[in-house]
Amino acid sequence: MEGGSEKTTPEGCGGESKSKRKMKTAAQLEVLENTYSAEPYPSEAIRADLSVKLNLSDRQLQMWFCHRRLKERKSTTPSKRQRKELVTPTAMESWEPPVNAGDLVAGNELDSRRAARGSGGSGVTVVRRFNEPSSAEVRAIGYVEAQLGERLRDNGPVLGMEFDPLPPGAFGMPIEMPSHRKATRQAFETNIYVRSDVKPIKDHVRPIREYQFIPELPSSRTDHSERVSPSHHFGVPLDGSVMRVSAVSAGHRDDYKISPQIPNLNLATHQGKPGHVYSPNLVEYDSPYQKSYMDTAAQVHDDPFVKSEREVGNEDEDDDALQLERHRKNEEARIAREVEAHEKRIRRELEKQDMLRRKREEQIRKEMERQDRERRKEEERLLREKQREEERYLKEQMRELQRREKFLKKETIRAEKMRQKEEMRKEKEVARLKAANERAIARKIAKESMELIEDERLELMEVAALTKGLPSMLALDFETLQNLDEYRDKQAIFPPTSVKLKKPFAVKPWNGSDENVANLLMVWRFLITFADVLGLWPFTLDEFAQAFHDYDPRLMGEIHIVLLKTIIKDIEGVVRTLSTGVGANQNVAANPGGGHPHVVEGAYAWGFDIRSWRKNLNVFTWPEILRQLALSAGLGPQLKKMNIRTVSVHDDNEANNSENVIFNLRKGVAAENAFAKMQERGLSNPRRSRHRLTPGTVKFAAFHVLSLEGEKGLNILEVAEKIQKSGLRDLTTSRTPEASVAAALSRDTKLFERVAPSTYCVRASYRKDAGDAETIFAEARERIRAFKSGITDVEDVDDAERDEDSESDVGEDPEVDVNLKKEDPNPLKVENLIGVEPLLENGKLDTVPMKTELGLPLTPSLPEEMKDEKRDDTLADQSLEDAVANGEDSACFDESKLGEQWVQGLVEGDYSNLSSEERLNALVALIGIATEGNTIRIALEERLEVASALKKQMWGEVQLDKRWKEESLIRANYLSYPTAKPGLNIATPASGNQESSSADVTPISSQDPVSLPQIDVNNVIAGPSLQLQENVPGVENLQYQQQQGYTADRERLRAQLKAYVGYKAEELYVYRSLPLGQDRRRNRYWRFSASASRNDPGCGRIFVELQDGRWRLIDSEEAFDYLVKSLDVRGVRESHLHFMLLKIEASFKEALRRNVAANPGVCSISSSLDSDTAEISTTFKIELGDSNAVERCSVLQRFHSFEKWMWDNMLHPSALSAFKYGAKQSSPLFRICRICAELHFVGDICCPSCGQMHAGPDVGELCFAEQVAQLGDNLRRGDTGFILRSSILSPLRIRLLKVQLALVEASLPPEGLEAFWTENLRKSWGMKLLSSSSHEDLYQVLTTLEAALKRDFLSSNFETTSELLGLQEGALASDLTCGVNVLPWIPKTAGGVALRLFDFDSSIVYTPDQNNDPLKDKESEDFVGLETNILRNLHEKDVMETPVQVAAYKQEENWTDPGLGGVSSSGRGGRPPRGRGRPRARGNGKKPAVSVKPPRGAANSNGETMLRPRAQPRGGRKNGRRSGTKGRKRPTQGTLGICNEVGGGRRVKEVAVTAKTSLPDNDDDWIETPELQDDDGEASSSGRSFQYEDYDDDDVMAPIDDFDGGGESSKLVGRGEFSLHSDDEYEEEEEEEEDMNMKMDVNVVDDEDEDYINEDSYGRKQHGISISNDAATRKRFNKFEDPDLTSSSSSDFQ
């Protein structure tokens, strides 16, 4: 139906066709129709798209849509619909529209007739207009909208119009109408009702009417009502018909009304509306006939939609219909005219709008054109300007080019002229230079013949002359001299092969590593150099090397203690200066970095208390303090950068910064973090074997993977891949899984074997069948799960049970067979006094312990290779891997940075378990830290200052007698050998009585054509006046000398003299390393001796540091002579080296002979020698204790000396606070045996250990502290029998810890004990103490005792175990019988337990007045300041001296050498030596060269100390040769210090080491447990005591390495020096040191009969070291007398 309308749209849309109008194509119409069906009123955007798509104007589109809408409206009229029905009757046959309910209500007979005609005629039903809604629909819609209060939505649900008939009685229906209802129903059922398809009407979206101004069209109804299709179902119309039928039958025909049952559905209201479908003209057809007809029809048909057959025959109604049709046609014609008029108006309006739009577009277009014209004009203008600019630039450039060309032409001409002039000048200059060079060569040759030449150049000149066949290098031409580098490949080896260089040591670790040898020598030199600063006794290199191989060396303990004290003192000094603002030394304040801030920060990070280090540093605790210091300094495992704040129990708003971090340190770590954090460090686990396999680790996974691979093994990448595939370890969390695997495989050589580079396999005994791989992996995964869940406590016994699964611990001895089974849980072990297992050469355990003559078992320290293999990275293997097994980030320190191995060794065991190399590395690291502190730095600066001043003074004295010296030397040089010939070598035999005579000999190499005189300045520069040289060696070409005069000799003599002056000054005040000299290859020659005496074994050795870092030794006279002969004295370096070698020749050879006589055999190197035994020196006798009985006896004696030292220090009353303040209990629990020093209960009648009866009443009346003090007094009186008797009972440190614990328990105040600490519990505790055999057991005992003391009786700064572990108070004491919880991070070592014990003891409040003790360290102050004892100036403060010191001053004839630490005859402890007698006088009866007046501090007749008057200013030469020594001040006795005089004043530097008299009251923490003592009077820490006699100034040859304080430990290796200046600075000339006024004294002393016997600590006689007493060298070391160790006290430590 729409299709026809669409085709006629172009013609009928406008009513009239225009002549220019074009028809639209089919495609355009199709698009327009589709658009119209979707949107009858298209928007501008849609029209624009259509305009582009269809090529139509917007006006054409508007007109088309307007006509299309009008056509749509026209298609709804009845005439058009009738025409359509007539045209297509067949199309409407099947459509039977319903009868309009409104027609029935209004009585419209026209509809009835049309319906009748349609049914009886052609069969085509008469329908309503297309989209005209019925009256019933309109009323229903209005009714619903009235109820809803709003209009219906277009897209809402369909409104129902057909309903079932009402039941009888409902809404006014009669109850009985059976006949009518039945007839109606039957009539309805007989009529075939075909409902029309309403879907097209429903789906049709009727647009909003455009022409609403036409009154005939329904314009008042909204889009909702228009779009609702009429309903043909039973509904409201049916109900209304029924009601009307009822009203007609009741006689109400005249007044038709709507039934009151439907009050809101007022149909009459819709009839009068303009938009209603019924016209008002239809009222005329409402007649009584019609009403009666409808009543009859209603009675016959209850349903109004049922057609009546009588309607067909009503002809009258046809006429009405025709009339109505005509009327409608008229109306439509009128409407069409109006529409056409309206369209014309719209067309005109659109044309007007189009005209306006075109005008606007034209204006816009003109504006845009105008802007375009302006823009083009501007662009053209800019282009013209740019072109003009370019033209101008090109013109300028052209002018510039022309100008340059002109200038270049001029310059070229000028340059050509200049070149010609220059060529002429050069020709003249070349000629002039040639002549000048010839003259210069002549002068240089003449000068080189008189002066020293650079050694390497000299050698190259000799090689060149020899190659060219010239008789002398003087004949070399200028070209050859300029190209000497061409002859470098022809240089010979130097030192020559005739100089036999040997390896210095024959045992490990020295024979395999030159780095270790270098570290050993440099460490020893540092300690000897700063012995006065550190407070050390001098010791030889032999003793030092032997200490590395002893099990428990006393020397190592003393060295570590003084170094730790120095470091802590540096920290304390800086902190005190920063806190108070005033420092005792301004250097400290100026250099806060000297206080080791990195150590302080590290200690804070680890939770260590530096105050505890200072208070508790002693012979027992130093290994643990060393471990904590190493961790703090970053030498151990590195802490991860984690935001962890450790909150201490007593942390009160502490701030962590570089200045006050020391003050804010609190002991321990935070209670809530301590346990978990330290468990991650692995410190809570006991020491485990390095070969154990922890489930979940990389090592565990690698072992199971490789056990299936056989002997070929896998490389690292394959192992990592298979581990990942097996699921035993997740390597994806690691950034470097291959590195982790490689580290795990390379560390354990017992389980894994390297078969190729980066390829490993397991040992044969651990390999498995590859067919069982799944089973093995399943078991391994199960073990990992069990381990993580805590089911399996993987201990050693567990591994022993799984030996068949290759997870057992293998022996840690590298020589033990790996197939050794562990079925025997208790293999035979030899426990001896040293605590190690003896091993035979085959590596097996020796079941029979070695016995000494005393019947005591003896085993020396383990060999180096065993120690190196025995203790490896257990901490890294175990703790870190355990932490990684629980997550990569769980570990608190970095797995890739494990630190030094010796730090881990101190965690796992005591210091005695470290290997020699680890001990050396520990010392190197400790010295590296110490050199960064202010103590060493200040000492270096002051020594540099003093040495510089002394050099100027010494050179000034030489200058005062310059004229006399020149005359004397020239006379001696030219009159001694009047008959000497050129090239003749003159050598005078060395005198056997005087070293000076031998030093006068100057052997000259036969290859030297011109020999230079060597001046012995030994007797020239050492005194205030110079003496005439008696024998001046040296041979010169006298004819040449006569020609050149005396100038060369004078200059050469002056240079050598000045160099020697500087050398001697730096030797007295060492601030840098000074070797003997260097050769042409810059190999350096060293002499490491503690003194210049011939009795020092070091005097008989010369170490050679080769250029490549190797160390060799010259220990034979032949090698020495060959070396001296091979030196070319014309060279600068070798001339000085030759001079120094000649100076030490006599002492070297004599000491060498003594060494050979004292050690006729070789050292015990049976299993450690290299293949080339001829190159190994035998001068070092290192006793390992496994070669013969003598060595075993020596080892045993040294160990007894160490035990005595330990007992003496630990039994001292100042060792524990319990000694001073402890309460005397009425019922002591223990007593200590006087025979064997073992503990036993008071009730025991005899000692269970030795069987000694204790019936004496005196012992029973003494408290336990008095018994310990009595034992210490016996020890200091010389009764050391209990030490020997108790050595075999239990280890030394275990016994000492037991005594200390018992003493603390016996001194606890009774009121301070908890209520649960009953007598039975106390006895049980004592039984556990006596039965303890390990440090772990003793730590349990200590923790139990700590829990028994009330918190009020402990210092507030002390954190108990309960507080640190976060336990409730008293939780530790809940079940003491089953063990207590201990701090897991404290190592189970003697040092760790002892440090905790001393810390606990110092925190106990024994007495109420304890805090009032002035000697008690005040806890309220952080680091109570100590007086700086380093190089104190005595101008303002004089130190009181003890009677022993005064007596020492009177021993003028045997006064000690200040250069060796000055140990007097009173020995180490301040008392006369035992078994030595009075010091012997000189054998030849000669008196000492220097007479010393009574010292300033000597005692008067009343015993009072007097102050010696100051030395008078020294004059010139008026006092003669000895005038300078008469006024010289003797060094202050009793201190290790440095004394010197500058000009006319006095300058005294003193170091008070541990003297109480020089310490303030608050410093007794440093001296409460002095370690540097020996009541037998031993001189050295290893037992040697020294007596020193007078020695020549010539022999003071102990140059010490220099330390600049800022270096690291690595700088000790090889050629790395610790110097404030360069290595070769001593070679430089200082011309400004010409005008000083000090004279030097030369003392010629005969020390041929210098012979005395030293006695070491264990009674063996050794040669001492004799040293002269010349004034020039009395500045090295002063005699050390510790007031604490002198006889003025009641005991050594009181």
Curated annotation (Swiss-Prot):
Residue ranges of domain DDT in the record: 514-573
Skewed-composition ranges (Acidic residues): 795-816, 1561-1578, 1589-1605, 1624-1635
Tissue-specific expression: Highly expressed in growing tissues such as inflorescence and flower meristems, young leaves and floral organs. Expressed in roots, rosette and cauline leaves, stems, flowers, inflorescences and siliques.
Gene Ontology MF, one: DNA-binding transcription factor activity
Basic residues bias locations: 1471-1485, 1515-1531
Family annotation (InterPro entries): Asxl_HARE-HTH, DDT_dom, HD, Homeodomain-like_sf, RLT1-3, WHIM1_dom, WHIM2_dom
Gene3D superfamilies per the UniProt record, alphabetical: Homeodomain-like (1.10.10.60)
Annotated HTH HARE-type domain residues: 696-765
ATP-binding recorded as keyword: no
Record region (Disordered): 1-24, 795-822, 1450-1541, 1555-1639, 1655-1674
Matching PROSITE patterns: DDT, HOMEOBOX_2, HTH_HARE
One Gene Ontology cellular component: nucleus
Xref: Pfam families: DDT, HARE-HTH, Homeodomain, WHIM1, WSD
A GO BP entry: flower development
Function: Transcriptional regulator required for the maintenance of the plant vegetative phase. In association with CHR11 or CHR17 may prevent the early activation of the vegetative-to-reproductive transition by regulating key genes that contribute to flower timing, such as FT, SEP1, SEP3, AGL8/FUL, SOC1 and FLC. Involved in the transcriptional regulation of seed-specific gene expression.
Subunit (UniProt): Interacts with CHR11. Interacts (via the DDT domain) with CHR11 (via C-terminus).
Database matches in PANTHER family: HOMEOBOX-DDT DOMAIN PROTEIN RLT2
Name of the molecule in the record: Homeobox-DDT domain protein RLT2
Gene designation: RLT2
